[in-house]
């Protein structure tokens, strides 16, 4: 099956077949990270610029490693080192980047729709590494890959996503992706962190974490994004932990073989206890590991890759 997308802007625009192709391609690339020499010549001669206007550790580093393992020339630009701090507009930034003739731009931005804006105005491929509270497609894809590896399938699973749904681009991308692949999605959080009309995304909404977690195959905890919310949304971290934190007792309500996920960074003792975060059901580091393979797959596919078997030799 051919991948017919020049850009990766969101999961909402993808089909189930697109998602499956990305996951299958990522599986094939996982072997590269296990080699003594972790590099293949797949994207030799290609230039990838990682433009991050928001702080990031996992996503930026993961994309950088992914590009280098594919032999691409990778360049990193952060907000603090860009001309944006001097007043340059996003449109002017786009024009200047295009003048340098990159092949792929990986962008994270605090404004929803910024990667779309770039894609509409430039010839290079754009990969959305997170835009505001809109979407974070590569995170959802690595989450799906982790679930598929641990459970063997996604269709028919019950996935509970707990936390700050309003500000979570991870939640939105996961809801889109899980629905397309046939999972049942549950959302839970304080009323102030559940956006109006969230049911329209195709998820059940719960007020109590105990109800949301009960019988779940996967429990995904979300970070409290204090940088995006007002003080009135969260009375105290202690109160949040009491009513919505994931503890060993609450995990007992899920299925015995349930897995625990978190996109990171974690606030230990707030959304998740250390006992759960370090426990046997946690697959958080598996998510991080799978992030490199998924991002290798995205860079490869938007570059027009067709026969992975040939490129990975």
Curated annotation (Swiss-Prot):
EC number: 2.1.3.2
Protein name as it appears in the record: Aspartate carbamoyltransferase catalytic subunit
Pathway: Pyrimidine metabolism; UMP biosynthesis via de novo pathway; (S)-dihydroorotate from bicarbonate: step 2/3
Domain of life: Bacteria
The organism of origin for this protein: Syntrophotalea carbinolica (strain DSM 2380 / NBRC 103641 / GraBd1)
Subunit structure: Heterododecamer (2C3:3R2) of six catalytic PyrB chains organized as two trimers (C3), and six regulatory PyrI chains organized as three dimers (R2).
Catalytic activity: carbamoyl phosphate + L-aspartate = N-carbamoyl-L-aspartate + phosphate + H(+)
Family per similarity comment: Belongs to the aspartate/ornithine carbamoyltransferase superfamily. ATCase family.
Purpose of the protein: Catalyzes the condensation of carbamoyl phosphate and aspartate to form carbamoyl aspartate and inorganic phosphate, the committed step in the de novo pyrimidine nucleotide biosynthesis pathway.
InterPro entries: Asp/Orn_carbamoyltranf_P-bd, Asp/Orn_carbamoylTrfase, Asp/Orn_carbamoylTrfase_sf, Asp_carbamoyltransf, Asp_carbamoyltransf_Asp/Orn-bd
Residues reported in the UniProt entry to bind carbamoyl phosphate: 58-59, 108, 136, 139, 264-265
GO terms, molecular function: amino acid binding; aspartate carbamoyltransferase activity
Assigned keywords, A-Z: Pyrimidine biosynthesis, Transferase
Binding site for L-aspartate: 86, 169, 223
GO term, biological process aspect, one: 'de novo' pyrimidine nucleobase biosynthetic process
Cellular component, GO annotation: cytosol
